[in-house]
Structure formats: C-alpha cells, structure tokens
A protein has these predicted regions:
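A well-structured
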Residues: 1-314, 325, 598-602
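Short pre-active-site segment immediately N-terminal to the catalytic Zn-binding motif
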Residues: 317-319, 369-391
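Catalytic zinc-binding patch centered on the HExxH motif and its immediate surroundings
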Residues: 317-319, 352-372
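Conserved helix-loop functional segments at active or binding sites
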Residues: 330, 334-341, 367, 396, ...
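Short beta-alpha connecting loops at secondary-structure transitions
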Residues: 375-379, 406-416, 446-453, 472-474, ...
Length: 602
C-alpha cells in the first residue's frame, strides 16, 4: 500500500481500508444542518436560569435538555475531527473542526449555571425530587456526584473569581509546553562514524534504541545538556505548577492536592500508596532485568542511555494488515462470541482507517460518540507494534460500543481511571496467544518487547507517581521546593528503582524537567494502575473462562460511568484498594523474565 496517496486517491482506490464517516452524516451538508440545529438550540437554557429548584420536573427537563444537546454536539464534533485527522492539509475540515470546537465552548459557557444552581438546592430536597419523579432516576448518580462536591464548592462569586483565575494559574504549564516543544533546541547527536543526526523531541527515543552506543550517549548527553542549562527556570516552572495544585486544593477545602485530584474519580488515596508500596516490594525483579540487560549487551557498565536499545535484533517479523486481523481474532477468542461479534462488526463495517496517506494525522487512536460507531485511526506499516496498536484500539472501541449500547448517554463515557484497562487487557490476551504460537526466535522478540512494556508502564510510571507526590508533599509541608531539591529527590528514586546495575549520573537527575506528565496533576499513576488491573483481568479470563468473561463484559465494559470506577472494577473481579492486582502484574513480569532468560540460554 503506497504511503504517498492523497486522501481522495486512498478513498477511491482502497475504500475498504478507510473508515466510513457517512454512518455519522451522509455528507458535509448534513453535518452543516446538524451544526445549525445545535447552534439554534443554544439559548433554550435561559428558561431554566433561576428555576432549577422549582420542581422535580423542571430539574429533569433542564438535565435532559443539556444531555440531549451535548450528545448531538458530540456527534457534530466527532465528524469534524475525524475529517480533519484523515487529511490535516485540508483547510475545509480544519475550519469545520475549529467551528465545532468553538461551539463546544459556547455550549459549556451557556450551561455553566447548571451545577451551581443545583448546589443551591437543599440535598434532602434533591433526594425527594429523585424519589418522587421516576424520570430523574436517569440522573440519580450524576446528582449524587454533584452532592458529594458540596463541602468543596464555595459561594458563586468566589467560584467565578477562581474560574477566571485559572487561565493565569495555567501559566507554568503553558510556559513549559512552549519552552519544551517550541523553543528548546538540541545539538546534533553524533554517531560512531562522526556523522551528525538532527536531535529533536521526536528523534530522541529513536536514537536511544539504536545499536550505536556512541549515538545513544550523544543523544542522551545533548538532551540533558539543553534541559540542564535551564534547570533553575524549569524548577521554578514546575514549582509553580505544584503551587497551583496546592492552592486549588486548599481553597476548595481539601487537605492535599492529591486528595482533590483523586476525588474527581472518587479514588481512595490508599490506591495510590498501595501502588507505590507494592511496586517497591518487587523492585528486585527490575534490578534482575537490568542486570540481564547489562550481561546481554556485553557491557561492563550499564548507563541510563542503554535501557532502550532492543536486546533482540535482526529478526524480521512482517505483519501485513490482513494477517494481523487473523491474529487478533484468534487471540480474542477467549472473550467469547458476544465480544468477538463486536470486533468483527468493526472490521467488516469500516470502523478502521488503516493506512497512511498524505496529511493524515500520525499515531493511532479510538474515537467516536454516543450516537456514532467507534472509529479507529491507524498508520499501518506492517510491524508487530501495529498489531498491538490494532488490538489496543479495538479494546477501547469495544469498551465504548458496550458502554454506549447499555448505558444512557449521560453515563456512557467511562472515566480516565479505567480507560486503559480494556485496551491493555486485549494486549495481554494477544501476548498470551502469540507466546503459544510463535517459534522461539520470534518469542524472544515478543518477550523483549513485553518486558520493556512492563518496565516503561508499571515501574517507570510508578516512579513518576512517587516523585510527583513527593514534590507536592514538600510544598505542602512548607519546605522550599527548589531545583536542587528536585534533582536530589529524583536521584534517590532512580537509585531505588534501578539498583546498582545501572549507573546514574547528574544528567538523569534532571529527567523530571522533560516529563510533561508532571503538569497533569496526579494523572500518571493511572497508567500503572490500569496496566495492573488489565493484567489481573486477563489472567482471570484465561484461567477461569466464561465466569470471568461474563463479569468482565457485564460488570465492566457495559457499565460506562454508572458507578464509581473503583466499584466497577471490583465487580469485574479486581480490587485496586488491595495489593493483589499489582502483585499479579509483577508476577506476570517475573514469569516473562524467567521465560526470556530460559530462551536466551537455550
């Protein structure tokens, strides 16, 4: 498949490998009509201002109108953003996406009175409304979530002031983004033959994966030389972000920034502590893996820039798309007929946009809305990684399909805390199937990639989570949060996580300054918890069979956001308030490490 086709050529020559957006709107004219319809309905909310608490029926009508309009708007936006992503050079669709985005902002602004007005109603009165008016049952859980925020909502004038201040408070994050992505320039990386290679944020990891150790070291040194030259500035920027989080938490009557951040998804704080504590217990496994890496690379000293280069090289593993579909369907057979039928529907009904074309957005994702099919964007290049992306994105898409089919629109979106569970569970099922059906040479390649996935997701993201909590705790204790202190704390964590087999130095102590996740307010821990939950659920599916599959589909995939995410996972068979899922994930890592060592010595 040519990667140089224009979008029009791609759709004309290979329509079966493009997504079918006519299932959303027949054509652009239908999109414009739907856009106009939503636009014209803005203003209807005025009838409810000052009257939300008048009666149960009024409350229901307001919630229903907001939900209905929001759902229509979501459909409009999804069409525009998918059209833009299939060809980012097309000004027409860039304009459509921009207009749809602006309409979302207008909609949000128009309805911003709703939650504050609900909070002006006495909690008992809301409960009596729900009990006496059956239609309100649809929104009972939403109202419960709003009620739980009461101790943390201030008077309307103060909330308005704080909302207006958020733009200014976002300055640290905005400054970091512009500095890191736009202003920062790296010296070229030099390879063993003295050739210069342009070094950017995009090429950095590629060079760290190189066989050429001189190129790896040069890339590593030059990146941290650039960040290190601005250590004081970046320290002040991150400290500003931490101060913002602490300020927002304290002004809303939370004890800590973490308590506020986790309360958004009703996650108990012990889930966070439990993750860190349990991963600490299994760090000797990570040390064993890094020691093995040192041995297999034949190095006297393993440096941080040696951690990314593959241990298994020169094994070709081509994966054409048609073959990948077969691998996926076989790997997902343990999920049963109901699940497989959804995947087959997606493959047969053009949910997937497979190949690259001129102007197409890079990467891969799953998108969609309550009133549309799920849609998957890929840029297929016949690699094993592409197969994993396909399986991963179908995990998201099947989750979305079941949630939207079995939940009303107001509870069909699942939370960030569980978002990566379904996708990563599919990856684990694929790994299990491939491990049983590949020859030893390709198994080695696969195991190497899986061990790296564990290192990068479970261990590394937990280390990030530990650092993030540490710097917030320093600020909350009243101690000065300086760049020097950040370097020291990060150095301690690198030593703890990587042990004696990896030599750390001053450069890696500044790695915190290039990690954008530290500007995402207690987001990063969810990569590790989601990964652990997925490993646990896939283990149950493979060992228990149908009972585990039924729990997974009925109690997790079909539940959307109809309950707290912790409870949804618990009902599916994973209790993230206990160490068990993290322990199971670490034990899977150990099994894969054992298998890898055994094959290497065979």
């Amino acid at each position: 498949m040519s990667q140089q086709l224009s979008r029009e050529e791609q759709e004309r020559k290979y329509p079966e490998y493009t997504w079918d957006l006519t299932t959303i709107f027949k054509d652009d004219e239908a999109f414009e009509a739907a856009f106009k319809e939503v636009e014209n309905e803005l203003g209807k909310e005025e009838q409810f201002k000052g009257h939300i608490g008048d009666s149960a029926e009024t409350l229901y009508n307001a919630l229903e109108l907001e939900d209905t309009l929001g759902t229509k708007l979501e459909k409009v936006y999804v069409y525009a953003h998918l059209k833009q992503d299939q060809d980012t050079t097309n000004d027409k669709y860039t304009g459509m996406e921009s207009r749809a985005h602006q309409l979302i902002i207008k909609f949000s602004s128009a309805w911003s009175f709703l939650v504050p007005e609900i909070l002006q109603i006495d909690e008992d009165k809301i409960q009596s409304f729900v009990n006496s008016y059956d239609k309100l049952q649809k929104f009972a859980f939403d109202l419960k979530l709003i009620n739980e925020k009461r101790p943390h909502i201030l008077d309307a004038e103060t909330e308005k002031l704080l909302t207006e201040a958020q733009d200014a408070l976002s300055t640290p994050s905005n400054v970091y983004g512009m500095f890191s992505n736009a202003d920062l320039v790296f010296e070229d990386a030099i390879d063993k033959d003295g050739n210069a290679h342009p070094l950017t944020q995009g090429t950095f990891i590629k060079y760290l994966e190189s066989d050429d150790r001189k190129l790896r070291e040069s890339a590593f040194r030059n990146v941290y030389k650039a960040y290190g030259a601005h250590n004081n500035t970046l320290g002040a920027t991150l400290a500003g972000e931490v101060k913002k989080n602490v300020f927002n938490a304290r002004t809303h009557n939370y004890k800590t920034a973490r308590e506020k951040a986790l309360s958004n998804n009703h996650i108990p704080e012990n889930v966070y502590d439990n993750l860190v504590k349990t991963v600490h217990k299994y760090l000797p496994l990570l040390h064993r893996y890094t020691e093995l890496r040192k041995e297999l690379l034949g190095l006297d000293d393993l440096k941080m820039y040696d951690l990314y280069t593959p241990l298994i090289k020169d094994i070709k593993f081509e994966m054409p798309y048609e073959e990948a579909k077969e691998w996926m369907l076989k790997a997902l057979e343990p999920m049963g007929e109901e699940y497989l039928n959804v995947v087959k529907e997606g493959l047969n009904n053009r949910w997937v946009d497979v190949y690259e074309n001129k102007g197409k957005r890079s990467g891969g994702y799953s998108s969609g809305a309550h009133l549309t099919n799920p849609f998957i964007l890929l840029n297929w290049s016949n690699t094993i990684s592409d197969l994993y992306t396909l399986v991963h994105e179908f995990g998201h898409s099947a989750h979305s399909y079941f949630s939207r089919k079995f939940q009303p629109s107001n509870s069909s979106d699942y939370t960030i805390f569980v978002a990566e569970v379904a996708s990563t569970c599919n990856e684990a099922l694929l790994s299990d199937y491939m491990d049983k059906h590949l020859d030893d040479e390709k198994r080695l390649l696969l195991l190497n990639q899986e061990l790296e996935r564990f290192r990068a997701t479970l261990f590394r993201q937990t280390m990030f989570a530990e650092f993030e909590h540490k710097i917030h705790a320093i600020e909350e204790s009243g101690e000065p949060l300086t760049p020097t202190r950040m370097n020291e704390e990060y150095a301690k964590l690198n030593k703890l996580y990587f042990g004696d087999s990896v030599e750390t130095d001053e450069d890696i102590n500044k790695e915190w300054s290039r990690i954008p996740h530290f500007y995402m307010n207690y987001y990063v821990y969810q990569y590790a918890t989601g990964y652990s939950a997925a490993q646990s659920l896939s283990h149950q599916i493979l060992t228990e069979g149908k009972p585990a599959v039924d729990r997974y589909i009925n109690e997790f995939l079909k539940k959307g956001s109809s309950n707290y995410p912790i409870e949804i996972l618990k009902n599916a068979g994973v209790d993230m308030t206990t160490p068990e899922p993290i322990e199971q994930a670490c034990e899977v890592f150990e099994q894969k490490l054992n298998a890898f060592e055994k094959l290497m010595k065979a």
